[in-house]
Amino acid sequence: MAIKPAYVKKTGTLLMERYPDAFGADFEHNKDVVEELTNIESKGVRNRIAGYVTRKMNNPVEA
């Protein structure tokens, strides 16, 4: 598994802090939320951020 770029982590973390109730464990839902809350035009970047947020929502505790 690859390490996510800093801009994906930074944007994802910022969105989760500002809108904690907007995200869930479903990738498709998170993808739509990221599209609504940001001005990111790139589909690939949007999906990477949504995937990062989904992964964090499914596994909130880090060891």
Curated annotation (Swiss-Prot):
Keywords for the protein's UniProt record, in alphabetical order: Ribonucleoprotein, Ribosomal protein
InterPro entries: Ribosomal_eS17, Ribosomal_eS17_CS, Ribosomal_eS17_sf
PROSITE patterns: RIBOSOMAL_S17E (PS00712)
SUPFAM superfamilies xref list: Rps17e-like
Any Gene Ontology CC annotation: ribosome
Coiled coil: none
Pfam families in the cross-refs: Ribosomal_S17e
One MF term in the entry's GO annotations: structural constituent of ribosome
GO biological process terms on file: translation
HAMAP family tied to this protein: Ribosomal_eS17 (MF_00511)
Family: Belongs to the eukaryotic ribosomal protein eS17 family.
Protein's name in the database: Small ribosomal subunit protein eS17
Organism, as annotated: Haloarcula marismortui (strain ATCC 43049 / DSM 3752 / JCM 8966 / VKM B-1809) (Halobacterium marismortui)
Protein's gene: rps17e
